[in-house]
Amino acid sequence: MIRKAKQSQKAGDGSNQYQAETIIVQNGIDEKRAREICNEMFAATRRELSEEAYDAACRRVNEFENDLIPKMQKIDGALDAFADPAFQFLIADAHKTAASTDRPADYSLLSELLIHRIQRGQNRATIAGISRAVEIVDEIADVALLALSVSFAVEQYNPTSGSIFQGLDVLDSLFEKLCYAELPSGSMWLDHLDILDAIRMSHFGKLKKLEEYYAETMPGYCVAGIKKDTENYAKAQQLLVEAGLPSTIMVNNELDNQYVRLALVSRERISSLSLTSVRIIDGQTIQTTTKLTADQEKTLGDIWNLYDNDASTLERIKAQFYHEIINRPNLRKVQAWWNNVPTAFNTTAVGKVLAHANAKRCDPSLPDLN
């Protein structure tokens, strides 16, 4: 926006007049203008309210805006979304939902949904999910949202650490943050979420047991690996040397120290690995990170192929993995709940954005939803 400041000119009789003009250029929308737009969008909703409801609605909407705008200010260019008509309509819907609820957590949840709209606004399916989610924030029961968020976290988040114990500790810490209340039993919460279009219940079958699900999605944690002091062990060490890879990429298997394994959650993670080298030049530490070459990736795949696949050994490793899950209090709590969910279900686009927004509210460090 370009705005002209007030102009002033003074001159004596017969003298030349020179006009000074200041041009103020404003790039984008600042906090003040963002709040003005919010106020303009809420004006229509205010007109629909009775005198008795007016004060409560204004207070709630103000709490919502005070949660939203500081979050948007932390994201480069996010306030410019207020110039988008589609975002303004979404703000208007969020105002109606905020005015209808007195749960403080709902204001934070609405904020996270709008932030997600800014960050993933090019995907029409996501936009549709967010729009519907904004409408039902005030309708979803606390325990249903909790269950939705925990089930979403089970399916969405896996650790990246190559260490089995560290990876499970990360999950345990996550569920400590997400399980802010007692998880629901029975099927009422499922019916409730199905009515709100957050899930689609399947009346055929049950969810796979949590420990089995994690064993499948984190296969690098449930391998035996290569037994020490064997021919395959020597072969693996030689392959690492020939490929110029550090021997530290092979670690003791925490579930059986007779074996070593690649420090990976899954074989697919090989393609995302990189090597970091540290050099000291003129007293300064220089750190360089490079992607693995195709040959190095192939070498790690060849080492994976050397793993012991004896069925009885793998069953023993898997049993130890299950034990490590129940040895962590929050994972044990989620496992006991998950394994007793009465029926299988699929989370819809609406449910995913709701669950993600609530999870981010509990743990802001979580990655954004793709």
Q: Where are the regions that the model predicts?
A:
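Intrinsically disordered, low-complexity segments
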Residues: 363-370
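Long, low-complexity intrinsically disordered regions enriched in small/polar
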Residues: 1-51, 55
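Amphipathic alpha-helical interaction segments
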Residues: 117, 121, 155-159, 200
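N-terminal leader regions that mediate targeting or early regulatory function
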Residues: 64, 68-90
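Long, low-complexity, charged/polar intrinsically disordered regions in eukaryotic proteins
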Residues: 82-139
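Extended, charge-enriched "interface" segments that sit outside catalytic cores
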Residues: 61
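Accessory beta->alpha helical hairpin/"wing" motif in late/C-terminal subdomains of nucleic-acid enzymes
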Residues: 104-118, 165, 181, 186, ...
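Short amphipathic alpha-helical interface segments
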Residues: 135-181
